[in-house]
Amino acid sequence: MELNQVKEQLLKLQSRLSAYAHAMESISYDGQTVAPKGTAENRAHALAVLSEEEYLIKTGSETVALLELLDNNKAVLTEEEKRMVHLMLKDIRRMQSIPMDEYIAYQELVVKAEDVWEDAKKNNDFASFAPYLSEIFETNIKFAKYCAPDKAPYDYWLGEYEDGLTMEVCDEFFAKLRERIVPLIKHISASEQVDSSFLKGNFPVAKQEELSYYLMKLMGLDLAHCGLSTSEHPFTTSLGSHLDERITTHYMEDDFASSMYSVIHESGHALYDTGVDDKYLYTLLDAGVSMGIHESQSRFYENLLGRSKEFVAFVLPKLKELFPSLKDVTAEALYRAINRVEPSFIRTEADEVTYCLHVLVRYELEKKLMAGEIKVTELPEHWNKLYKEYLGVDVPNDKLGVLQDSHWAGGAIGYFPSYALGSAYGAQLLSKMAAEIDVKDALSKGDFSKINDWNREHIWKHGSLYRSDELLEKALGEKFSADDYIDYLEKKFKEIYK
């Protein structure tokens, strides 16, 4: 077979696998949104069958031979083809390390765990979820040892979400954040507090939904390729390619800001996914490169833009139109209220200053669980202890504590540090962007076009072509540093809390 034919086979293989991904992601999305409660067993069965097919395709001798032939002829491959081969071989070697029956059983476990978690959260019943979560952590430890026996299991999974990330890197990063953020929190606590009482009230879900679509359109999302639904925990997913994007939110009638910022956050993810260059359609490059870069985009739009003085002032007339109780609220009052700093229980509703401490709690617990230092049954106790130590709050129940996030139920062990890293990436990207375009002026006009064009050119269009560190360095012209993020927090919040 000629090399051009081999390259064509590579594209066909990726296209076929993207169709399997579409089917499996659709089943998962359905389960977290509109699927009836009694369908978990059926969905688990379907995912098990599809997972077996996917496993056999990826680990089959024909696929392995194809990839090894291409890998041995790297000199004649394009940059894109080399990256496709690298990513596929990495995935295949991971799968080859895990016995097929265990891989399939894990896919079934996650479907059931997500279903049980949703009920457990609603009923404040951690005990019913604990056996599933124990099995998820045990399986992740086992799989990590299969795939990288010379690595600590947690280091392996951290690196799967963010290339090169380790506990050592995380420890250094979080230590730097705490060094400057803890004094900032003390400064804020000693200052006059901000009134945010008007953010609570009666905000009909229908009006909040109208606001959601307004925000998605305002941010530049193509609604022909991006849908909105509701779920217990907001999330974003691509169904097989960047042509089919789904985001979800969770409405609370007494709090419009919760869903408003969830929608802005998830829309940031969706802009990244749908912004990948069309030439990568149905290939492994048709996705964001890492969860850290993904969170840099979601938290960039949610906080750096969405909580800015300029954006808040622009969107206020729309809020007053939808919610009459806000008719006397000024732009300055709303800006201060939206940025109120107050230690709380819920990560997704945390302010920008204390947010990284929520992530740190999860990181510390994952580290201990993956090292076998604590048991899942002890998790609520350790969770509540760290929340008291880091945020000074007494967690009243598990629904507002250890059960609040869906990530562990979905098997996403090692994901959480990406949120804090993404926030820091985003601040550095904003510094670079603001040196080239007038971001504040654009936001004051509600015009995201130049902002999106910059992100598309520097981040989105590249998909998974580059490693995350390479992508950042190309976009920034320098290596990553957390300094811009901490400087941003200090400047912004010392102006609000004088």
Question: Model regions: which residues?
Answer:
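Secondary-structure capping and boundary motifs in well-ordered enzyme cores
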Residues: 42, 102-105, 132, 173, ...
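Divalent metal-coordination and catalytic microenvironments
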Residues: 10, 148, 265, 298, ...
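Contiguous, non-catalytic segments that form substrate-binding/exosite surfaces or channel walls
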Residues: 106-258
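A well-structured
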Residues: 1-163, 490-498
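C-terminal, non-catalytic "cap/extension" segments appended to globular domains
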Residues: 2-6, 25, 38, 42, ...
